[in-house]
Amino acid sequence: MFKNIGLAVALVAAIPSSAQLAPGVHMPPEIGLAYGRLGTAMMAHDAEGVRTVWADDFVVNSPNNTVLSREDVIAVMERDFLDYRNFRKHITFVGEKPEMTVVMGYDTMIPVKGPGAGKQVMRPFTDIWARRSAGWQLVARQATIAETR
C-alpha cells in the first residue's frame, strides 16, 4: 500500500495558483486551464473532476518504476493521501505539436501524509497532453522524486 501511496504522491500535476513559467516559455491556454481544473480537483479529492482532465488511458511511470493507471491514482487520492503544503509547479519547457503537447519542469512541495511527510520534495516531471474529442487531456506522466530535504 505504501508503495502505491508513494507513487501517487509523485503524480499530482498542478495547483494553478502556484505555477511558474520559465522566461520565454508559453503555455497553451487550453492546457493551462486544464492544469487549473486538475489542481482544483486534486485539492478537493474530486475523482470526477480528475477524470475530466486525465484521459481514460492515462498512465504514469512513478518514482519506483511502477506504472499506474488513472484509476490506481484516483483510488489513492480517495484514501486521502494526496495532500501537500507549499506546492509549486515550475514549468521549464512546453513543446507544441498539432495533436500533442509536452510539458516539462519540476514540482516542489511538502507532503502532509505518507512518504516524505513534512519534508520538502523536489520532483521533475514530464507530462504528455493529447488533443482528444473532449479537448486536451493528460495521457501520460513521468515523475521522479529527485530530492527530499
Give the ranges of each region predicted by the language model.
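Intrinsically disordered and other compositionally biased segments
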Residues: 7-8, 19
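N-terminal signal peptide c-region/cleavage motif recognized by signal peptidases
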Residues: 14-16
